[in-house]
């Protein structure tokens, strides 16, 4: 059942660990894209229209058709344990942004990670000229720059959220620290 553009303002790209709770919290209806097209917790909620689209392999036309009703994007993609990070975060984001080139988007929100910042013992802000230390951070930083420059060139408002402590299902931070009780300081 198609949903009109007026009734579907937000598309959540990536409805896994972060995107799924967000999609459920947004006012109905919500357009949701996932690599698998499945909803792990039983049936897809009635307010959510779920589409299976893998950003790494989807063609521009398919992405544009699915996203055409959206007026805002929230990008919550994550590389799986066996996926190539560059393919997901750079190639997939490029494909997504290309597909949205002619859409009248009012805002793009990108969920990133604090790994996009360098490892410093001190205060950091967005003006820090130093690159991130590891490959993961460098790819995240590159993806942020891609989003920023593309949105600015199109005049689309954008927000990058750098989240910390993202470990995904079954890898909660507490469980990681449990092995070393001294790692958690009051």
Regions found by a protein language model. Give the residues of each.
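N-terminal Rossmann-fold NAD(P) dinucleotide-binding loop
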Residues: 19-20
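Short-chain dehydrogenase/reductase
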Residues: 86-90, 125-145
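Conserved N-terminal Rossmann-fold NAD(P)-binding element of oxidoreductases
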Residues: 10-14
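Conserved Rossmann-fold cofactor-binding substructure of NAD(P)-dependent oxidoreductases
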Residues: 45-71
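A conserved pocket-lining segment of Rossmann-fold NAD(P)-dependent short-chain dehydrogenase/reductase
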Residues: 173-186
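Conserved Rossmann-fold NAD(P)-dependent oxidoreductase catalytic core, especially the SDR/UDP-sugar
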Residues: 95-134
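NAD(P)-cofactor binding segment of oxidoreductase domains
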Residues: 70-109, 145-146
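Conserved beta-loop-beta element that borders a ligand/cofactor-binding pocket
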Residues: 145-169
